[in-house]
């Protein structure tokens, strides 16, 4: 069953187009290494919660929009191999990110329902 690596970040709203281009480049890179697809979603209807929400989780500023994305892999072993290749590839360190990557969070997820 496919394995998912999900990401949440806060992106300056003014950088939407730069982020879209960055995501396209990253998606091509992930796919070259073994991912099957990348999905990037720009926050459109994201409510603020009393206890927690996308804004609090990323320490968003007033001029930032939450982004939710995921990379799909054929399996966890492929995801692990891709992450290893990425950690060894110095070209990724030079990729300019149009957001504060320190406030991004991510994790790997095993699918339990896929309909």
Model feature map: region roles:
Residues 20-26, 82-89:
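Short amphipathic alpha-helices in soluble, non-transmembrane regions
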Residues 31, 35-62, 91-115:
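Glycine-rich beta-strand-turn "strand-cap" elements at beta-sheet edges
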Residues 4-11, 50-86:
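Short, well-ordered beta-strand segments in beta-rich or mixed alpha/beta enzyme
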Residues 3-40:
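N-terminal first-folded block
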Residues 17, 77-79, 114:
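Residue-level signal for secondary-structure boundary sites
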């Amino acid at each position: 069953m496919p394995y998912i690596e999900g990401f949440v970040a806060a992106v300056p709203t003014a950088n939407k187009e730069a982020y879209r281009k960055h995501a396209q480049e990253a998606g091509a890179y992930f796919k070259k290494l073994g991912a099957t697809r990348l999905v990037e979603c720009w926050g459109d209807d994201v409510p603020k919660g009393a206890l927690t929400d996308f804004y609090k989780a990323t320490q968003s500023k007033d001029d930032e929009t939450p982004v939710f994305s995921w990379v799909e892999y054929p399996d966890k072993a492929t995801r692990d191999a891709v992450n290893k290749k990425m950690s060894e590839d110095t070209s990724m360190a030079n990729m300019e990110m149009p957001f504060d990557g320190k406030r991004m969070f991510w994790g790997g997820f095993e699918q339990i329902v896929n309909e």
